[in-house]
Amino acid sequence: MAMTPQLAFSRMPPGFRFQPTDEQLVVDYLQRRTAAQPCVTPDITDIDVYNVDPWQLPAMAMYGSDHDRYFFTMAAREAQARRTTPSGFWKPTGTKKTIFVVAGGHEVPTAVKRRFVFYLGHHQPSGSSNNNKTSWIMHEYRLMNSPRAAVPSSSSVNRLPTDDLTEEMVLCRISNKDLPKPPFIHNGLLQFSSVGLNGDGYNYLILDHLEPPAMEYPNVDIGNVDDAAAADDDPGDLDEEIDDSMQRNHGG
């Protein structure tokens, strides 16, 4: 029987908050998950993150802080990776960060962390797109020497295929810096008619149609998605610095 988010949280002690550092995510979760070893917490949800719109994800997560949710997913190897969802796509911003893990008294480069911003609309050739940036952020963690991911017998909500050597297991941290006001209902950007339930009982939105978005970032030319994403490089790096600083202050 699949564990629901409500059941998962009910098994945690009072005051429990899931706020792992980058190193903990890599060592205690991603490495152990790819080796089919039990993680510290019972489950981080397995789900096809790149086939689901980000606003559907929070209700599917087992663990997370007030603004972060964590998922395991299978992703194409970096050179072939496409991160397109039904309503938009994830665009990389900033620079990749190497995560070092202490082993044998030495810091060993073990994983790569990359930041993405979600854009509404479909990816088009440069100069011909009509996309709009949202406040949904994803940090993707990949092992530098990733083995083929094994599926433990107690795998969580959704089992993912693992026999394709062109794919690898990654860990994703999804957040929305504008919560609790989701961007998909801001200014009537998306219209929806009802709330439904998927097979596991999680809420999701049934979207009727996507209206042309209002411009929320007047200083960015969203007619060119590559330029718009490039304009995020410096803010993305700043977000990484703030994130790293907070982890150090909490002992990460």
UniProtKB/Swiss-Prot annotation:
Localization terms from the record: Nucleus; Cytoplasm
Record GO cellular component, one term: nucleus
Residue stretches spanning the membrane: none
Record region (Disordered): 225-252
Summary of the tissues where the protein is detected: Expressed in stems and panicles. Expressed in developing seeds.
Gene Ontology terms: biological process: regulation of DNA-templated transcription; regulation of seed development
UniProt keyword annotations, A-Z: Cytoplasm, DNA-binding, Nucleus, Transcription, Transcription regulation
Subunit structure, as described in the record: Forms heterodimers with NAC26.
Protein name: NAC domain-containing protein 23
Organism: Oryza sativa subsp. indica
